[in-house]
Curated annotation (Swiss-Prot):
HAMAP family: Ribosomal_bL9. Binds to the 23S rRNA. This is Large ribosomal subunit protein bL9. Belongs to the bacterial ribosomal protein bL9 family. It comes from the Bacteria. It holds the Pfam family Ribosomal_L9_N.
Length: 171
């Protein structure tokens, strides 16, 4: 299926790019999410005329996301959960829970699909989680999972000493 991107898509292309993608990917993801349109002759002409509008709209969205990223930067989210003695959680911390807590902290609605987890969080500790609000912009938050507030504070102190040791080594 040939499509034309009307929004930037990470690892695929930018606005106005004409691509050949798998039928299922186009039909089930790109078209319903309004990330692309079919590459028909009328649509090709339309994109040539409206490419500047799409780029201006994307630039405006990007500026908004940069403001939100400034709020998100250096956020530390603490989750208090029940866990076994060896630190394994009875359950897990999901990307939806991270999105909900982050949304409250920055007063902006962040979808769980914007939270990128390398692996599921199933034990206590300190994790770095990627937040991707725009195809070209991402930020990182620190997620601390602990059994109690005091344990969370201990993890924070550990993280600070690791960071200061890393800075001392690089200097």
């Amino acid at each position: 299926m040939e499509i034309i991107l009307i929004k930037p898509v990470r690892k695929l292309g930018k606005i106005g790019d004409m691509l050949k993608v798998a039928d299922g990917f186009g039909r089930n993801y790109l078209l319903p999410q309004k990330l692309a349109i079919r590459a028909t002759e009328p649509n090709k002409e339309l994109i040539v005329k409206q490419k500047h509008e799409f780029e201006a709209k994307d630039k405006q969205i990007r500026e908004e996301v940069e403001k939100i990223n400034a709020l998100i930067k250096d956020q530390k989210l603490v989750f208090i959960r029940q866990a076994s003695d060896d630190g394994k959680l009875f359950g897990s911390v999901t990307n939806k829970e991270i999105a909900d807590k982050l949304s409250k902290n920055v007063s902006y609605n962040i979808s769980h699909s914007n939270i990128i987890l390398d692996k599921q969080i199933k034990s206590t500790g300190v994790y770095t989680v990627e937040i991707r609000l725009h195809a070209e912009l991402n930020d990182i938050v620190t997620v601390i999972v602990a059994r109690s507030e005091s344990e969370a504070q201990d993890y924070l102190r550990e993280k600070k000493t690791e960071t200061s040791e890393d800075l001392a080594e690089s200097a």
